Amino acid sequence: MNRRGRFRLYAGAALVAGLLLRLWFVAHLARVAGDSLVYGELAKNWLQSGIYGFGHETTSAGAIVVRPTLIRLPGYPLFLAACFRLFGVENYRAVLYVQVAADLLTCWLASALAGRLFGGRAALVVLWLAALCPFTANYAATPLTETLVLTTIALAFYGFARWQQAGARFNRWLWVTCAALAYSLLLRPEQSLLAVAVVPAMLWAALAMPGRRMGVLRSTAPVWVAALCVLLPLVPWTARNWHTFGVFEPLAPRSASDPGDPQFHGFNRWYRTWAIEFASTDLTYWNYDGNRMEIAKLPARAFALGCLAPGGVVPESLPLYAPTAALFDDYNQQTAASWPVDDRFDQLARRRIRASPICYYAALPIARVLNMMFRPRVELMPIPDTWWKSPTPPRQTAFAAAYAALNLAYFLLAFAGLLAWRRRGWAGFGALAGAMAAAVALRLLLLLTLDNSEPRYTLELFPVFLVWAGALFASPSARPATWAGIAAEQSG
């Protein structure tokens, strides 16, 4: 077998291995709960009643009326509705299989882009790194936006590279990039940052094209048209929200509440004065306004006047333990948010912020982002949130630690690859490199503003990281233009 045949064999083996890994997650760790059911209900009601909203019981016995909502963008419910139409309503197993295919497409796109930038060897290594990445594969087994968002990110950067190679004019790759950016924006509101990173880089690429004698306006016309097309899908959504609710809402409200719903901010502010770990998100943040909250689940720093509690001190002796315990007791009487309870949380928050503003505005946001980046990504597995504490079985603790080490390895490969790419002078793709770096930086800046730490919010870095890692395995020969060219390079 020649080198070309071996390349195709190894690439095929990577995709098969990636398929088996994702099917294993679907078979053993599929999870349909929480936000998955929220999206599912929106899709079902949209499909069956034509109303994008949630069902509510009326005073009539057993009667359900669907009321419109705007708390979620329609991109993922649209995907679910299409799957429900094809495979049956609430057939989530079929949805997961479609997501498996989408995730494998993400692997291929990252590999193909790495091949164009760094050659065939890099393409093959990136394909294996992507196919065997358990963190992205795990999310293919749960009906959430993450898998499709990763695909749109990979497609946007791949389309950008192809568009630039084709002369940065009006061509099919311009429309591919537009579609990827637009649908990514319909999936999650913060994906507007992807367009913010990519569109200026496209302007840069259009203006920097060698030999172009057109004026600035004509040279950049494709980019302005692309920017308009990215925003077009938001027009009917914005018009619908104005017509239905009387509010201007082109995306989705950060509070995840409809107009007229009470918005309680005191608890969230208090939570931001001490929270770092995903365990706090799961055990406290998600329980507010609906479930009991246990004060024993709070770390000692939640009762201190500062970022950290003194070592060796029992929580009950800290200055804010008594008022916090009394507030928890009152809340747990009803397990529902109310203005008096929320005001007391706000008072606690203000007291803590006055005592240590640097902690609230800088130290804790950075700590939360670091936790999202480097925590073991086992949140979808039957492993305790506090995996490092007893009584977690030692085998589970060891597995979580190994997962954290693997995650760190992906980060190190990515940033080492970025430095290697820079040493190569970006190989003619400086605008693309700038867009990728901007997408990562903007996302990390956004995460600094969030209340709750969730590792899934940093999954969106992986399509970029995989391509960057490919620079460490760059071929010394010229870049191939196509995947067929990559294989042909191997036979040369």
Task: Identify the residue ranges that each predicted region occupies.
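Short hydrophobic/aromatic helix or loop-helix immediately within or flanking a transmembrane segment
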Residues: 42-47, 60-89, 100-101, 460
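Membrane-proximal stem/loop segments at transmembrane-domain junctions that anchor or position
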Residues: 250-378
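Membrane-interface anchor segments at the N-terminal boundary of transmembrane helices
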Residues: 8, 90-94, 334-335, 343-347, ...
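Loop-to-helix entry region of an early transmembrane alpha helix in multi-pass inner-membrane enzymes
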Residues: 74-81, 86-105, 127, 139, ...
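Transmembrane signal-anchor helices characteristic of membrane glycosylation enzymes that use polyprenol
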Residues: 6-33, 229-240, 442
